[in-house]
Protein backbone atom coordinates (compact mmCIF):
# COMPACT_ATOMS: atom_id res chain seq x y z
CA UNK A 1 0.00 0.00 0.00
CA UNK A 2 1.27 3.46 -0.94
CA UNK A 3 2.49 5.99 1.61
CA UNK A 4 1.56 9.15 -0.26
CA UNK A 5 2.18 12.85 0.31
CA UNK A 6 -1.41 13.01 1.55
CA UNK A 7 -0.68 10.40 4.21
CA UNK A 8 2.50 12.20 5.26
CA UNK A 9 0.59 15.46 5.53
CA UNK A 10 -2.04 13.80 7.70
CA UNK A 11 0.72 12.44 9.95
CA UNK A 12 2.10 15.94 10.42
CA UNK A 13 -1.36 17.06 11.54
CA UNK A 14 -1.49 14.11 13.93
CA UNK A 15 1.88 15.11 15.40
CA UNK A 16 0.51 18.60 16.09
CA UNK A 17 -2.48 17.06 17.87
CA UNK A 18 -0.16 14.93 20.02
CA UNK A 19 1.95 17.95 20.91
CA UNK A 20 -1.19 19.86 21.86
CA UNK A 21 -2.16 16.96 24.14
CA UNK A 22 1.14 17.19 25.99
CA UNK A 23 3.51 14.78 24.25
CA UNK A 24 6.91 16.49 24.43
CA UNK A 25 9.43 13.80 23.48
CA UNK A 26 10.53 14.89 20.01
CA UNK A 27 12.22 11.57 19.25
CA UNK A 28 8.94 9.76 19.92
CA UNK A 29 7.03 12.22 17.74
CA UNK A 30 9.57 11.80 14.95
CA UNK A 31 9.21 8.01 15.16
CA UNK A 32 5.42 8.24 14.92
CA UNK A 33 5.79 10.60 11.98
CA UNK A 34 7.78 7.93 10.12
CA UNK A 35 5.31 5.06 10.61
CA UNK A 36 2.50 4.73 8.00
CA UNK A 37 -0.37 3.94 10.38
CA UNK A 38 -2.90 3.53 7.56
CA UNK A 39 -1.13 0.37 6.43
CA UNK A 40 -2.01 -1.33 9.73
CA UNK A 41 -5.76 -0.70 9.44
CA UNK A 42 -8.52 -2.63 7.72
CA UNK A 43 -9.90 -0.95 4.60
CA UNK A 44 -13.07 0.15 6.41
CA UNK A 45 -11.03 2.47 8.64
CA UNK A 46 -8.43 3.80 6.20
CA UNK A 47 -9.88 7.29 5.93
CA UNK A 48 -9.69 7.61 9.72
CA UNK A 49 -6.11 6.31 10.07
CA UNK A 50 -4.63 9.57 11.33
CA UNK A 51 -7.35 10.47 13.77
CA UNK A 52 -6.34 10.09 17.41
CA UNK A 53 -8.56 7.06 17.90
CA UNK A 54 -8.28 3.31 18.45
CA UNK A 55 -9.80 0.92 15.89
CA UNK A 56 -10.62 -2.83 15.88
CA UNK A 57 -8.17 -5.17 14.15
CA UNK A 58 -9.81 -8.56 14.80
CA UNK A 59 -9.79 -11.18 17.57
CA UNK A 60 -11.32 -8.60 19.91
CA UNK A 61 -8.13 -6.52 19.73
CA UNK A 62 -7.50 -2.91 18.70
CA UNK A 63 -4.79 -0.74 17.20
CA UNK A 64 -4.01 1.71 19.99
CA UNK A 65 -4.87 5.38 19.88
CA UNK A 66 -1.77 7.34 18.73
CA UNK A 67 -1.77 9.36 21.97
CA UNK A 68 -1.55 6.10 23.93
CA UNK A 69 1.33 4.86 21.78
CA UNK A 70 3.16 8.17 22.18
CA UNK A 71 2.55 8.25 25.93
CA UNK A 72 3.72 4.70 26.58
CA UNK A 73 6.76 5.09 24.35
CA UNK A 74 7.72 8.33 26.11
CA UNK A 75 7.43 6.67 29.54
CA UNK A 76 9.97 4.03 28.51
CA UNK A 77 12.80 6.61 28.19
CA UNK A 78 14.39 4.71 25.32
CA UNK A 79 17.92 4.90 24.00
CA UNK A 80 19.13 3.31 20.74
CA UNK A 81 20.39 -0.25 21.15
CA UNK A 82 18.27 -1.11 24.18
CA UNK A 83 16.68 -4.56 24.36
CA UNK A 84 12.90 -4.17 24.67
CA UNK A 85 10.21 -6.78 25.30
CA UNK A 86 6.78 -5.84 23.93
CA UNK A 87 3.85 -7.82 25.32
CA UNK A 88 1.01 -7.78 22.82
CA UNK A 89 2.16 -7.27 19.23
CA UNK A 90 -1.40 -6.61 18.06
CA UNK A 91 -1.38 -4.84 14.70
CA UNK A 92 2.37 -4.23 14.89
CA UNK A 93 1.97 -0.43 14.97
CA UNK A 94 3.46 0.09 18.43
CA UNK A 95 6.28 -2.32 17.56
CA UNK A 96 7.07 -0.24 14.47
CA UNK A 97 7.31 2.92 16.55
CA UNK A 98 9.69 1.18 18.95
CA UNK A 99 11.85 0.01 16.06
CA UNK A 100 11.94 3.55 14.68
CA UNK A 101 13.44 4.54 18.04
CA UNK A 102 16.44 2.33 17.26
CA UNK A 103 15.86 -0.36 19.89
CA UNK A 104 15.98 -4.14 19.57
CA UNK A 105 12.45 -5.49 19.96
CA UNK A 106 11.29 -8.91 21.12
CA UNK A 107 7.52 -8.96 20.68
CA UNK A 108 5.04 -11.63 21.75
CA UNK A 109 1.38 -12.02 20.73
CA UNK A 110 -1.19 -14.37 22.28
CA UNK A 111 -3.51 -14.59 19.26
CA UNK A 112 -1.99 -16.71 16.49
CA UNK A 113 -3.85 -15.00 13.63
CA UNK A 114 -2.66 -11.56 14.76
CA UNK A 115 0.86 -12.89 15.29
CA UNK A 116 1.02 -14.16 11.72
CA UNK A 117 -0.57 -11.04 10.25
CA UNK A 118 1.59 -8.53 12.12
CA UNK A 119 4.82 -10.48 11.52
CA UNK A 120 4.13 -10.56 7.79
CA UNK A 121 3.19 -6.87 7.78
CA UNK A 122 6.27 -5.65 9.64
CA UNK A 123 8.63 -7.78 7.59
CA UNK A 124 7.08 -6.44 4.38
CA UNK A 125 7.80 -2.92 5.63
CA UNK A 126 11.43 -3.82 6.30
CA UNK A 127 11.17 -3.81 10.10
CA UNK A 128 13.34 -6.33 11.92
CA UNK A 129 12.06 -7.62 15.25
CA UNK A 130 12.03 -11.00 16.98
CA UNK A 131 8.44 -12.32 16.78
CA UNK A 132 6.89 -14.89 19.11
CA UNK A 133 3.43 -16.36 19.60
CA UNK A 134 2.56 -17.27 23.18
CA UNK A 135 1.54 -16.15 26.66
CA UNK A 136 3.01 -12.68 27.04
CA UNK A 137 1.79 -12.38 30.63
CA UNK A 138 4.72 -14.63 31.54
CA UNK A 139 7.19 -12.61 29.50
CA UNK A 140 9.93 -14.23 27.43
CA UNK A 141 12.49 -15.35 29.97
CA UNK A 142 14.88 -17.16 27.63
CA UNK A 143 15.90 -13.90 25.95
CA UNK A 144 15.99 -11.72 29.06
CA UNK A 145 16.87 -9.72 30.95
CA UNK A 146 15.51 -6.64 29.19
CA UNK A 147 16.29 -2.95 29.46
CA UNK A 148 12.62 -2.14 29.00
CA UNK A 149 9.33 -4.06 29.02
CA UNK A 150 6.12 -2.65 27.56
CA UNK A 151 2.67 -4.20 27.98
CA UNK A 152 0.07 -3.07 25.46
CA UNK A 153 -2.88 -4.78 27.17
CA UNK A 154 -4.51 -4.21 30.56
CA UNK A 155 -3.34 -6.51 33.35
CA UNK A 156 -5.20 -7.29 36.61
CA UNK A 157 -1.90 -6.93 38.50
CA UNK A 158 1.82 -6.60 37.78
CA UNK A 159 3.14 -10.08 36.88
CA UNK A 160 6.13 -10.95 39.04
CA UNK A 161 7.81 -12.74 36.13
CA UNK A 162 8.01 -9.49 34.19
CA UNK A 163 9.86 -7.80 37.04
CA UNK A 164 12.22 -10.77 37.25
CA UNK A 165 13.03 -10.41 33.52
CA UNK A 166 13.90 -6.72 33.90
CA UNK A 167 17.52 -5.58 34.24
CA UNK A 168 18.53 -3.55 37.27
CA UNK A 169 17.90 0.03 36.19
CA UNK A 170 15.24 -1.19 33.76
CA UNK A 171 11.70 0.11 33.31
CA UNK A 172 8.39 -1.73 32.99
CA UNK A 173 5.40 0.21 31.62
CA UNK A 174 2.10 -1.60 32.09
CA UNK A 175 -1.59 -0.67 32.42
CA UNK A 176 -3.12 -2.28 35.52
CA UNK A 177 -6.74 -2.34 36.66
CA UNK A 178 -10.08 -3.92 35.82
CA UNK A 179 -11.38 -4.54 32.31
CA UNK A 180 -12.92 -1.08 31.98
CA UNK A 181 -10.08 1.26 32.94
CA UNK A 182 -6.48 0.90 34.03
CA UNK A 183 -3.79 3.01 35.65
CA UNK A 184 -0.66 3.32 33.56
CA UNK A 185 2.20 2.27 35.81
CA UNK A 186 5.90 2.86 35.33
CA UNK A 187 7.99 0.58 37.50
CA UNK A 188 11.75 1.02 37.81
CA UNK A 189 13.95 -1.79 39.08
CA UNK A 190 16.36 0.10 41.33
CA UNK A 191 18.00 -3.06 42.71
CA UNK A 192 17.08 -6.75 42.61
CA UNK A 193 14.93 -6.15 45.70
CA UNK A 194 13.76 -2.55 45.26
CA UNK A 195 11.08 -1.49 42.77
CA UNK A 196 9.71 2.05 42.53
CA UNK A 197 6.29 2.72 41.03
CA UNK A 198 4.70 5.78 39.42
CA UNK A 199 1.09 6.25 38.29
CA UNK A 200 0.93 7.95 34.90
CA UNK A 201 -2.75 8.46 34.10
CA UNK A 202 -5.89 6.52 33.30
CA UNK A 203 -6.23 4.52 30.09
CA UNK A 204 -8.41 1.85 28.55
CA UNK A 205 -6.86 -1.26 27.02
CA UNK A 206 -8.05 -4.65 25.86
CA UNK A 207 -7.41 -7.35 28.51
CA UNK A 208 -4.01 -9.00 28.88
CA UNK A 209 -4.85 -12.70 28.59
CA UNK A 210 -2.74 -15.53 29.92
CA UNK A 211 -1.64 -17.30 33.07
CA UNK A 212 -0.74 -14.02 34.80
CA UNK A 213 -3.57 -12.10 33.13
CA UNK A 214 -7.24 -12.57 32.36
CA UNK A 215 -8.72 -15.90 31.24
CA UNK A 216 -8.99 -15.87 27.45
CA UNK A 217 -12.32 -17.74 27.45
CA UNK A 218 -14.14 -16.26 30.46
CA UNK A 219 -12.42 -12.85 30.75
CA UNK A 220 -12.08 -13.57 34.46
CA UNK A 221 -9.05 -14.22 36.64
Swiss-Prot record:
It catalyses: [protein]-L-isoaspartate + S-adenosyl-L-methionine = [protein]-L-isoaspartate alpha-methyl ester + S-adenosyl-L-homocysteine. GO terms for cellular component: cytoplasm. CDD domains: AdoMet_MTases. It comes from the Bacteria. InterPro entries: PCMT, SAM-dependent_MTases_sf. Its EC number is 2.1.1.77. It is found in: Cytoplasm. Keywords: Cytoplasm, Methyltransferase, S-adenosyl-L-methionine, Transferase. The active site is at residue 64. One of its GO terms (molecular function) is protein-L-isoaspartate (D-aspartate) O-methyltransferase activity. The keyword Aminoacyl-tRNA synthetase does not apply. One of its GO terms (biological process) is protein modification process. PANTHER family: PROTEIN-L-ISOASPARTATE O-METHYLTRANSFERASE, PROTEIN-L-ISOASPARTATE(D-ASPARTATE) O-METHYLTRANSFERASE. Belongs to the methyltransferase superfamily. L-isoaspartyl/D-aspartyl protein methyltransferase family. Catalyzes the methyl esterification of L-isoaspartyl residues in peptides and proteins that result from spontaneous decomposition of normal L-aspartyl and L-asparaginyl residues. It plays a role in the repair and/or degradation of damaged proteins. This is Protein-L-isoaspartate O-methyltransferase. It comes from Cytophaga hutchinsonii (strain ATCC 33406 / DSM 1761 / CIP 103989 / NBRC 15051 / NCIMB 9469 / D465).
